[in-house]
């Protein structure tokens, strides 16, 4: 699979992201699943079967960006611009920073033939990391402790003798 459009940006965003990040690579395997990603790998099919998501931009795809994603009830639907009065203003704007991951999960789970495969950065939220939370908890507990080191403990009356 020789499709690297936007992959460099994805890697850069992953490296800059604080915390965990996941990058799914669509890799062809000629032994076990040859051609499984042809719908997005072949140049002639890629434009209609893949959507390149960029934060803050409308979710458009197709050879000339003639298709887009709209919300329909609790789901998504593919629409063609110009049909039924649909304009670019009706198309969803990608928000990778939204804390509510409902739409982002729907984008990640899209697959053909009814939907394009979402490529690019789907979700990029700032949240406390586990590591930061552990350090913060240690600092809070340490601040409340009566003794901060072993010497302070030994210099108190809270000691005992083993005989």
Residue ranges of predicted features:
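A conserved active-site cap/scaffold subdomain adjacent to cofactor or substrate pockets
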Residues: 19-24
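Single conserved hydrophobic/aromatic residue that forms the stacking wall/gate
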Residues: 1-11
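Flexible, low-complexity linker and terminal segments
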Residues: 27-163
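Short low-complexity, flexible loop/linker segments enriched in glycine and/or proline
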Residues: 12-14, 38-39
């Amino acid at each position: 699979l020789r499709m690297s459009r936007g992959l460099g940006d994805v890697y850069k965003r992953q490296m800059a992201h604080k915390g965990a990040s996941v990058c799914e690579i669509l890799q062809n395997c000629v032994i076990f699943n040859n051609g499984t990603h042809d719908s997005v790998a072949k140049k002639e099919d890629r434009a209609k079967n893949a959507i390149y998501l960029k934060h803050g931009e409308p979710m458009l795809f197709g050879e000339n960006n003639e298709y887009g994603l709209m919300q329909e009830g609790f789901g998504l639907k593919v629409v063609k611009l110009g049909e039924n009065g649909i304009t670019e203003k009706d198309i969803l704007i990608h928000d990778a920073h939204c804390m509510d991951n409902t739409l982002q999960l729907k984008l990640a789970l899209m697959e053909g033939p009814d939907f394009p495969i979402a490529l690019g950065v789907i979700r990029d939220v700032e949240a406390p990391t586990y590591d930061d939370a552990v350090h913060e908890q240690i600092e809070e507990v340490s601040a409340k402790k009566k003794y901060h080191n072993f010497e302070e403990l030994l210099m108190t009356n809270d000691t005992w003798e083993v005989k």
